[in-house]
């Protein structure tokens, strides 16, 4: 008998629910067979209550069945590890990588500045025109939330990262997320760094590669964010900005 697939989503906050002004602490998403759910629920709960940003007083867990006929399978990005010795070097490298991937210098600078200017972490992503650097979504501080994403085989995925000497929850989740983003039509590149205060590593995602950059912010900085650079010339009546956002927010994608 074929086992059903389920989406598990967790979000936690301190000071009440997010909708009532609670401060976001952590979140997670998994797509699992029904026989994997019980064990992973424990892991997700532990993540919620042990996060470095504090212990939440609100934890929301959501479990939904998935229609397997609607799942898309996409390839994983290649990991390229870079070396830098300072935040300034890291940001300079990020800008260069973005420019090499058809983002204008003006838009690359605006993308970096957009994250640096945040007073609190944006929940989703900001969408910028790759040429002008102008923000093209209207989601405000919520941003565009990328959901419906997981590894097609989490055990094999973790084993492959371990063989490459690249273990760690941040990398596991970021690489899967970046791979879905790269598969989205009209998005040419992504810039991201974490809001976890002690985690200063960030990345530039392109259509083929995940460029891991060791330092993109100061240690102790609790603000992070992500920017997607969009080739607006690919948007038209048959593929609109709304279609692009729907793919990111709603389409179930498993990464192979």
Curated annotation (Swiss-Prot):
It is an enzyme of class 6 (ligase). Keywords: ATP-binding, Biotin biosynthesis, Ligase, Magnesium, Nucleotide-binding. The keyword ATP-binding applies. The keyword Acyltransferase does not apply. It catalyses: heptanedioate + ATP + CoA = 6-carboxyhexanoyl-CoA + AMP + diphosphate. It holds the Pfam family BioW. One of its GO terms (molecular function) is 6-carboxyhexanoate-CoA ligase activity. Pathway: Metabolic intermediate metabolism; pimeloyl-CoA biosynthesis; pimeloyl-CoA from pimelate: step 1/1. Its cofactor is Mg(2+). One of its GO terms (biological process) is biotin biosynthetic process. Its EC number is 6.2.1.14. Homodimer. NCBIfam families: bioW, PRK01322.1. HAMAP family: BioW (MF_00668). Belongs to the BioW family. Catalyzes the transformation of pimelate into pimeloyl-CoA with concomitant hydrolysis of ATP to AMP. This is 6-carboxyhexanoate--CoA ligase. It comes from Methanobrevibacter ruminantium (strain ATCC 35063 / DSM 1093 / JCM 13430 / OCM 146 / M1) (Methanobacterium ruminantium). The lineage of its organism: Archaea, Methanobacteriati, Methanobacteriota, Methanomada group, Methanobacteria.
């Amino acid at each position: 008998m074929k086992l059903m697939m389920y989406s598990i989503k967790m979000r936690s906050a301190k000071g009440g629910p997010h909708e009532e002004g609670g401060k976001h602490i952590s979140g997670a998403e998994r797509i699992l067979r029904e026989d994997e759910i019980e064990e992973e629920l424990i892991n997700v709960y532990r993540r919620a209550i042990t996060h470095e940003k504090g212990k939440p007083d609100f934890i929301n867990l959501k479990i939904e069945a998935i229609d397997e006929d609607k799942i898309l399978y996409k390839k994983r990005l290649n990991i390229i590890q870079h070396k830098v010795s300072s935040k300034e070097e890291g940001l300079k490298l990020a800008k260069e990588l973005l420019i090499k991937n058809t983002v204008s210098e003006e838009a690359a600078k605006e993308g970096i500045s957009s994250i640096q200017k945040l007073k609190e972490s944006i929940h989703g992503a900001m969408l910028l025109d790759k040429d002008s650097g102008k923000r093209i979504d209207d989601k405000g501080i919520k941003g565009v939330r990328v959901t419906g994403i997981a590894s097609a085989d989490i055990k094999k995925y973790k084993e492959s990262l371990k063989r490459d000497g690249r273990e760690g929850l941040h990398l596991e989740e970021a690489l899967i997320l970046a791979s879905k983003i790269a598969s989205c039509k009209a998005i040419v590149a992504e810039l991201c760094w974490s809001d976890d205060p002690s985690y200063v590593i960030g990345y530039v995602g392109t259509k083929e590669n995940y460029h891991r950059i060791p330092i993109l912010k100061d240690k102790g900085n609790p603000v992070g964010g992500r920017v997607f650079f969009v080739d607006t010339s690919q948007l038209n009546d048959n593929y609109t900005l709304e279609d692009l956002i729907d793919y990111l927010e709603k389409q179930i994608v498993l990464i192979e």
